[in-house]
From Swiss-Prot:
Function: Binds 23S rRNA and is also seen to make contacts with the A and possibly P site tRNAs.
Official protein name in the record: Large ribosomal subunit protein uL16
GO cellular component terms attached to this protein's record: cytosolic large ribosomal subunit
Species of origin: Proteus mirabilis (strain HI4320)
Domain of life: Bacteria
Matches recorded under PANTHER family: 50S/60S RIBOSOMAL PROTEIN L16 (PTHR12220), LARGE RIBOSOMAL SUBUNIT PROTEIN UL16M (PTHR12220:SF13)
Stored PROSITE patterns: RIBOSOMAL_L16_1, RIBOSOMAL_L16_2
GO terms classed as biological process: translation
């Protein structure tokens, strides 16, 4: 599972997921899976989508993961009263804004890439779309 090796602080504030996306263009591969909605992806969801894509292309071509879960999410244990400090870090998430390219793929036909991204999109909680690299 993806998570940072080191962080400056163990826990962070909840914050808000606003603003515009960085990394909106397909830059490494030929095809991409772009987020249409706003939300957050857990490390487990990112890995599940990657596995689905890898199996769909039968380990051909190359896949790039363009998102990284760098925000720790804390939870308190079950049946624990409020107070007594912030909970323990349970999982890591990546904040996603509309327009962000989540995955890229190269070295496979377009139909295969579309099918693989469709399987990956089913594992993700946000709406996505298939995009291709635009040459200028």
């Amino acid at each position: 599972m993806l998570q940072p090796k080191r962080t400056k602080f163990r826990k962070v504030h909840k914050g808000r997921n606003r603003g515009l996306a960085i990394g909106t263009d397909v830059s490494f591969g030929t095809y991409g899976l772009k987020a249409v909605g706003r939300g957050r992806l857990t490390a487990r969801q990112i890995e599940a989508a990657r596995r689905a894509m890898t199996r769909a292309v039968k380990r051909q071509g190359k896949i790039w993961i363009r998102v990284f879960p760098d925000k720790p999410i804390t939870e308190k244990p079950l049946e624990v009263r409020m107070g007594k400090g912030k909970g323990n870090v349970e999982y890591w998430v990546a904040l996603i804004q509309p327009g962000k390219v989540l995955y890229e793929m190269d070295g496979v036909p377009e139909e295969v890439a579309r099918e693989a991204f469709q399987l990956a999109a089913a594992k993700l909680p946000i709406k996505t779309t298939f995009v291709t690299k635009t040459v200028m």
